[in-house]
Design a protein with these regions (language model features):
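Karyopherin-beta/Importin-beta family HEAT-repeat alpha-solenoid scaffold
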Residues: 1-270
């Protein structure tokens, strides 16, 4: 911990990075004791957060710090909740850093994904965190960024929904990206999981707003005889049907008939 703190003349960024990597390695061992680490938790989080915001340029350096924070979040679990707001507040400035080659942003997406997984379920005011996530996702799904950030962004989207008890407008609006993501085999399975979590939170609302476009995009996945992802949309459809009220099942059936989805499902059984 002494090496992790900023102390001019005693430590520098190189020493602090080595200390951060050592701390992550210690926290990741089976002998790590959560309660024994409790007296050092605040100092560790403050030091790592300060180092992360200190203008590190190398992606490996940023990754070392975010990895250390992720490991600590995993190991101390709910003890990390009080530090959630401060960690979330530093994300926008870091995300806005000049990063034309997208070398820093993957580490930030992984970090925020772990943050929402550990922090979001324990707060009532989830909308602000969801809005931050939506901003990161929208940027990540831009055509120039998607090949490098798309997979990590979808994981962040999934973890955010799985950790939420309600949908805010920014996350709902993101569903406009779903048909295009479903059309790409590398993203389709994760997008189906995202849809599953979404329909659990707001089954009727998303059915009426996005059902036609999303299920229209899923139909080719189900109907293609050699589709490698046929089960993912089937699971998503099943989840939605189970989540809907009886009164809304007719609307679901109409959408399945209006798209080729019902025919595709029957054809896949033959």
């Amino acid at each position: 911990m002494q090496l992790l703190r900023q102390a001019p003349g005693y430590t520098d960024a190189t020493i602090q990075l080595l200390a951060a990597r050592s701390l992550a390695a210690i926290a990741d061992t089976i002998t790590f004791e959560r309660h024994a680490f409790q007296p050092y938790l605040q100092d560790a989080v403050v030091a790592l957060a300060h180092l992360l915001q200190s203008g590190l340029e190398e992606p490996d350096s940023v990754r070392s710090i975010t990895h250390a924070l992720c490991v600590i979040m995993d190991r101390v679990d709910t003890d990390m909740v009080p530090y959630g707001p401060a960690l979330a507040d530093m994300v926008p400035k870091m995300w806005a850093r000049d990063d034309p080659q997208m070398r820093l942003k993957p580490s930030l997406l992984e970090f925020v994904s772990k943050l929402v997984e550990k922090y979001l379920p324990h707060i009532e005011a989830q909308a602000q965190m969801q809005a931050l996530v939506a901003r990161l996702l929208r940027d990540s799904f831009e055509p120039a960024a998607r090949p490098l950030l798309g997979h990590d962004a979808l994981l962040l989207w999934y973890h955010t929904l799985a950790s939420s008890y309600a949908l805010s407008a920014p996350l709902v609006e993101l569903l406009s990206c779903a048909p295009e993501l479903l059309a790409q085999p590398e993203y389709a399975p994760l997008m189906c999981r995202v849809w599953e979590e979404t329909v659990l939170l707001a089954p009727e609302d998303v059915l009426h707003a996005f059902g036609m476009s999303v299920y229209g995009a899923m139909a080719p996945m189900v109907g293609h005889p050699n589709s490698p992802v046929i089960m993912e949309p089937i699971f998503a459809i099943d989840m939605h049907v189970r989540a809907l009220s009886t009164a809304s099942l007719g609307a679901m059936a109409n959408i399945m008939r209006a798209t080729p989805l019902d025919e595709a499902i029957f054809a896949s059984l033959c």
